[in-house]
């Protein structure tokens, strides 16, 4: 319902007092489709719509995983939140659920309508539509949190002027309480993903941010030092850096300077939902190196900067790419110099899943009480609104069993690996008969402090697997996560001892897929699709750098020069720029004085070549001239005076020879011979099929091609 300069969609108020009656920022048809979708589909069905659409736009705007970037913030119902650049409402719902009131500002009416329709049940959301600089003077100055999620980089669009980012920040600062917070989530200009071959998020081209945006554009991201420089020059003295991983858009884990990632943790790096990317190196291995060198904070893909007083939360992990009733969040807090762990349900439906942790802890504590394995202590508590959360002992100065096993492999310490693995096997089998098994008793889920081993994860239990199956799963998971591990002789020895060959690995993979299906299955039968699978459905490529070299090698042509003694390797060279498209050759050959003939080898494998034309001395050769000077070592197919010749080369050394001395006198220095052709490379199977077809045609119709 619209009244004057306001409109109400459900409980959400849209304020058009400063709306210029025109949307200056709109994605057109994709936003029209989004608006129709949110008008008719309830939010609980968005996962299925995301799956059906298999598009970046629908995933980006409607995925509940976008909320993770603010889901950990210590916001409560006593607080007011300002969200600048609220867009289609990716995080508005999470803020509204946590805060007393949420004020949104966005330039686009259409995006604001999408936001309002999807959150129409929220009675604490007001959306101001229009330019921020027009709306800002009327906003209160006592917000507890001001959130700019993927917005600060557009400062020059919001403000303009010579120092737009400084001015933008100073204006925002006016609207925060003295003990309040500004929260900025932004890509790191030096993020590792950009070095590794991802396109810059805003410009969409390779290395644009690393090259400092030579083509310009509306957005500017910053390095850590660049952000700190702006904050300091604006007089900000209290700020804290957090590191969303893999990035802030679909964050699963939040690290901080007080809790940095450990070696081996950053392995989820294929996240190019929006565009094709290159794979220039193994990001996990480079992240591991950066962690060891103390440089992770400089190369994190994204930053979250929070100004104001430091919070207790130093780490947060979201396990919510799951069915609703299984979705949880794990926080690590630092209080009085000590750490503690808390696990929260992501929603009320997941409360029983948290409560089950206490039951599992009791079962495993009893089972392992006389073994060499301890069970991490847990206490079930309640939040102010009555939801359960688990408070769990934090183990200081620990290493995981996985880390210790990796160390043995790196040092080729077979005896050390065997000792650790044998102890693990004895633990897995301890008093196993007739009791629950910890399905996820894998190597990363056992912490080692000196000689004390502790089970730290007992979220998933089963009474359907034997200890042998638990052990096989753990070792197979360990190997599958890293090809180097899987190929190591020590790991191969233990896989063989357990009877795990290729067939058994396939069966284990099928069981793993079945478990993932269980985790994604809602209680009402609906199922969500994991982010990794959505990346495949959207269909953007991740192309290894090796393929570029393979394509480059395939697309090189070799030129031979004949000065009267025939073609020899000594008088040959490669042209790497002869291709003007994937299958089009435009070879410009500069001839030396005395050149009598030129041979062009278009490839180093069987192929089909259609010669589009040959130029000599600036003129295209006629058909009569081609008949006089052109020869190949292939079969010319369907050759007619009105048709350019197509040649089948059955050899791995195809060549096209042009005798210049048949056209005129031999070449003088610097004259150009140009050969244009289209090429199709043939695999061995394709060549065999063509040869069989030609032979059959020859038997039926006679000899219809000429050499």
Where is each model-derived feature located?
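Conserved class I S-adenosyl-L-methionine
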Residues: 183-205
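Conserved structural core of kinase catalytic domains
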Residues: 375-421
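A short glycine-rich, Lys/Arg-flanked "PGG" loop and its adjoining helix->strand segment in the class I
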Residues: 163-181
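N-terminal auxiliary segments of SAM/dcSAM-dependent transferases
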Residues: 1-41
